[in-house]
Amino acid sequence: MLTADDKKLIQTTWDKVQGHQEDFGAEALQRMFITYPQTKTYFPHFDLSPGSDQVRGHGKKVVNALGNAVKSMDNLSQALSELSNLHAYNLRVDPVNFKLLSQCFQVVLAVHLGKEYTPEVHSAFDKFLSAVAAVLAEKYR
């Protein structure tokens, strides 16, 4: 459960992500593809080379979706319902992959935010991204 302090930290930190959605998203995806190569199977039609337009475009979509979730922290299920349907019923993505991408996104935040990515911010984002992953996996049950 996100506390009021967690939500404030997430919103304040998210302001620093603004303007970098494509870069941060592409970097998180690249980290995931390298660290967890099995995740590439969900992108057979993509050019997965670093910096490709497809990876950058999808990275931007991912981070923008997270931005919408940040705006809707009190109602994640409604905010992410369409994405949950898409990933569960159309794309059939194994829900474990949401956790893998979350981990990679946290690394990207830590790299780019440096000392501003405090243990408290890390904890808040861990809770938030876990909640997002859980909501995205709801339709699999």
Curated annotation (Swiss-Prot):
One of its GO terms (cellular component) is blood microparticle. PROSITE patterns: GLOBIN. GO terms for biological process: hydrogen peroxide catabolic process. InterPro entries: Globin, Globin-like_sf, Globin/Proto, Hemoglobin_a-typ, Hemoglobin_oxygen_transport, Hemoglobin_pi. Red blood cells. The keyword Heme applies. Keywords: Heme, Iron, Metal-binding, Oxygen transport, Transport. Residues 1-141 form the Globin domain. Heme b binds at residues 58, 87. It holds the Pfam family Globin. One of its GO terms (molecular function) is oxygen carrier activity. Involved in oxygen transport from the lung to the various peripheral tissues. Belongs to the globin family. The sequence shown is that of alpha-D. Heterotetramer of two alpha-D chains and two beta chains. This is Hemoglobin subunit alpha-D/D'. It comes from Gyps rueppelli. The gene is HBAD.
